[in-house]
Each structure stands twice: as structure tokens, then as C-alpha cells.
Amino acid sequence: MSFYREVSSLKQILCLSNEPWSTSPGRTQQLLSRLRDTQILYFAPPAGRRDRSFRQKGQKVRPNVTVYTLPPTLFPVSEQYSRLFLRNQRKLGRFIADKAARHRFQSPLLWTTSPEQVHLLDHLEYDGLVYDCDRDWEELPPLWEGALANNADIVFAASPLLADRLSPCSSNIAQLPNGVNYPMFSGEGGSIQSDPLPQVHGPVLGWAVVIHRELDLSPILYAARERPGWTFLLLGRQEDNPLLPRLRRQPNVALAGPCPLNEVPDWLFRCDVLLELLREDRPDSDVISGRLYEYLSTGKPIVSMLWPEQVEIFPDVVYGAHDEREFLTLCQHALEEAPGFVSQRRQSYGAAAAWSLRAAAVSRSLDTAGLL
């Protein structure tokens, strides 16, 4: 009985995530795993229509966190087919409610991450609603996100533009930028272990994250052709990007593929300059990526591509280029940067974005709102 009282005294959180629980944690996992005195049921989206993970038992990934995979919708139905659409939402709601009941969840805080989840609100019991917005959901009906933000007790927004867009729908919006595992990427505690490119002796300029189809790789292709003595590293999972075949033919381009998260810092510290590129499908986004905070945490020089009228990001420590020629010129300047010139300032920006500090800000906001 005393154990039950101890468990019930913890704040219970139902998390509807838009990303799986992973060894390479995303925003939701980074934040919730750091909230203290909580008991969390984390519902991850299915990997596809044939994903049967929902039939498995919940996976206890932390002493206070249990992960379930939601059942897939075999035949996605548009909202205009109201009866079938509602049936799908009821199915998901029953699944979540059943798991919550098994874990003795009563009046939990509901943490949402996608406008699609607004349709589950009528099928779940909760006491307090959070909407964490980390992107522009332009592919979804605006009314969905508006309704979710309007119902939420507090909205977290990853950038000023996202906060402005949601301001007509909520009077309680807190800006919460992305963050970084600062100890890992700053090299604290001797986390840098080996040289992943022992055979390369010239300058190395690197990009480290998923190579999305929409990623504009033209600046790297241009620079690789102009500077054959430089090595350009592309680290991460590769999608069907139209410029990848041409980059593969460049002898000074290294396509390293994906690697475990704990090995990424070794690759970044092997680079002389780190590169931030643009995604053509996100021309209006002002969300600062977690990748940039990882770069800053290393203290290494950074060259970032910018949209024509984009406000420069961290202009005192990041070189901002607007075209391929300027990109090449600034890469040269970055290579010539005096050691330690602004590296400590870069790392101070990374330290200020540590996920531990972001989670502490979430806790304060929830406590102020009476939700935690």
C-alpha cells in the first residue's frame, strides 16, 4: 500500500509523441526523460501500416518511463469521411486509455506533439493539456492545430515565428528552443575517443545528420569541385537526394553513412569546419536545429547557408553565406580562424541550450501553470 501511495504521488504524464523512443533521442524524449518526480507513458507512432509492435508489452526504458507503440491505421481516412475517421480515433483512444488504466493512471497530464492528436482529446481522460510545437505543420489543416492550441493549458513553441503563429489561439505560450546534450558534444569527461578519418591529412569540412531528399547539397558540391585538397564529410542516413550521385563521384567527398550517437562527437571533432545547410521544403522556418547547438558545443568554426532575407543566426560566432561563392569564401575564412578566437563563446551558446536547462524551464512553466 505504501508503494502505491509513493507511485500515485508522482505526476503522471501521458505523452503522445510524433517520434519513436530511440538511442538517438529527439526533442520529446530529451525533455520528458529529464522531468523529475513523474511517471510517464510514452506512446510512439507506428513505423508503418504493417507495424505490429502495438501487440507487444510496454517497454520500460527508464524506471519511470514505459513506452508503447500505437496501432497503425490500416486505411488512412480523410476527416471528410466523418464516421470512418471517428472510428479510427476511437480505436486509438481506447488503446491509450486501456494502457493508462493498467498503469493506474488517474487524471494525468496529457502531452501532445502534433495537430493530428487533437482528435483524441474527446476520447481520453486527463487533467491538464500541453502542446509542444517544434515545427510548421503546413501539410495539416490549420484548424487542427488551432483547436489543439486553444484547448491546451500551455503551449511550448520552438521559435518566435511558431509562437507568433499560435498566439491568436493561446494566451499562454512559452518559447522553448531545441537543445543539446552538452556534456557529450563539448568533450567534457573525455568523451572523444578516436580519429574516424586517420587517412585524411588535409582540411575536413563536415555535415552530420540525416541527408534528407530536400537538403540543398549544391554548396558542398560547388566547394568540393573548387577545392580538391579539402575533404567534405557527410555523416548520417541518406535519403534519395538528387545531388548525392554527383557527390559520390567526387574523390574528396566522404559519405560515411549513419553511426551510433555516441560516435558522432568523434566525427565532429575530426572536422576543422562544420557546415549547416538549408532544406528546400522549409524556406520560412526559424527553428534552430539541435544539430546547430551540437556544432556550437564543440567550439569549432561553423559556416551556415542562409535564405536571401533570413536573419543571421548567432552572427558573432557563425559565418553566414547567401550563395555558393560566399559559402566557399567563408569556409576559407573559417579554416584560417585563429585557434580559440571565439570557440569559448560558441561553447557558451551550446551550454545555455543544454537539454537539462530546457527541461528545467519546462518544469518551471508547468509548475507555474499548476500542472506539475
Give a label for each model feature:
Residues 22-26, 215, 262, 267, ...:
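Nucleotide-sugar-dependent
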Residues 161, 179, 188:
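Carbohydrate-associated surface elements
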Residues 232-242:
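Glycosyltransferase donor-sugar binding loop
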Residues 317-325, 333-339:
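Conserved acidic donor-binding segment of nucleotide-sugar-dependent glycosyltransferases
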Residues 339-372:
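A charged, aromatic-enriched C-terminal amphipathic alpha-helix characteristic of glycosyltransferases
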